[in-house]
Amino acid sequence: MENFKGLQKSLYIWTDSADLDKRVEQLKSATGGDVALENVHRLSFSSYANSSFDLIVIECAQLTDSYVKLLHMLKPSGKLHLVSFIGPAASLLQEIKLSGFINCREDSPDALTAEKPGYETGSSARLSFAKKNASAINVWKISGDDEELIDEEELLDEEDKQKPDPAGLRVCSTTGKRKACKNCSCGLAEELETEKQSQKATENAKSSCGNCYLGDAFRCSTCPYLGMPAFKPGEKVQLGDNLLKSDI
């Protein structure tokens, strides 16, 4: 009882009325404060306000359903003291811990002490580690003005925009490929041969003046590119079919 000195308001829960006055006087002498009385069988019908007592002393520990209520009745950091309890101390300490008490200990073979946490039941506190670093937030902040959008049209070259020549997509009806079969009768063999001759003539065509790519205004009268639009130097140009045939 010496550990309870200075506690101003206590509650003594009794089971046996014999020598009750003597036990109450001992508690008053140890704490130096006021002591209220309550019968253990009437505790469930009591209506004590929360945080009413600094100390609660119980003569019997058969209060499995009332430990939480006692926790509410105690002030923050208030103490619960059990004497003359029945059953194993370890089992009783476990029940008290599960009810929310801390610092549960066995003072003697027939006495236990526990404490209510230093805050009111149901209270909340701000956690320091939950604060966010402002600089870290700004790093990941995305603004619509900062977005660099890519123009889809810039991803395509002029060559990509040109539609393919349907004639160049023709395939052999037998092989299913743009390659004539051995006994081609659909005309694909002649078409491929014409393209081959045209390509060969284009590769052999050379400019003596070096101005053929500029257009008809700069070309000779016998220029193979006469009548064709201007083109870039080194650009591959296909000559017309009329230039691939002999004049004689």
From Swiss-Prot:
- Principal localization reads cytoplasm
Q: Where is this region: Linker?
A: 130-161
Which positions does the motif Cx2C motif 2 occupy? 220-223
Q: Name one GO cellular component term.
A: mitochondrial intermembrane space
**Where is the region Fe-S binding site B?**
209-223
Provide the alphabetized UniProt keywords.
2Fe-2S, 4Fe-4S, Cytoplasm, Iron, Iron-sulfur, Metal-binding, Mitochondrion
User: Which residue stretches belong to region N-terminal SAM-like domain?
Assistant: 4-129
List each coiled-coil range. Answer: none
Position of sequence motif Cx2C motif 1: 209-212
**Cofactor(s) this protein cannot do without:** [2Fe-2S] cluster; [4Fe-4S] cluster
**Compartments (UniProt record):** Cytoplasm; Mitochondrion intermembrane space
Amino-acid positions noted as binding [4Fe-4S] cluster in the UniProt annotation, renumbered to this chain: 209, 212, 220, 223
GO biological process entries? iron-sulfur cluster assembly
Annotated disulfide bonds: none
Which residues hold [2Fe-2S] cluster?
172, 181, 184, 186
Give the span(s) annotated as Fe-S binding site A.
172-186
GO terms (molecular function) for this protein are: 2 iron, 2 sulfur cluster binding; 4 iron, 4 sulfur cluster binding; electron transfer activity; metal ion binding
What is the similarity comment for this entry?
Belongs to the anamorsin family.
> In the UniProt entry, what is the domain comment?
The C-terminal domain binds 2 Fe-S clusters but is otherwise mostly in an intrinsically disordered conformation.
The record describes its quaternary structure and partners as: Monomer.
Q: What does this protein do?
A: Component of the cytosolic iron-sulfur (Fe-S) protein assembly (CIA) machinery. Required for the maturation of extramitochondrial Fe-S proteins. Part of an electron transfer chain functioning in an early step of cytosolic Fe-S biogenesis, facilitating the de novo assembly of a [4Fe-4S] cluster on the cytosolic Fe-S scaffold complex. Electrons are transferred from NADPH via a FAD- and FMN-containing diflavin oxidoreductase.
UniProt protein name: Anamorsin homolog
**What organism is the protein native to?**
Drosophila erecta (Fruit fly)
The uppermost taxa in this organism's lineage are: Eukaryota, Metazoa, Ecdysozoa, Arthropoda, Hexapoda
Gene that specifies this protein: CIAPIN1
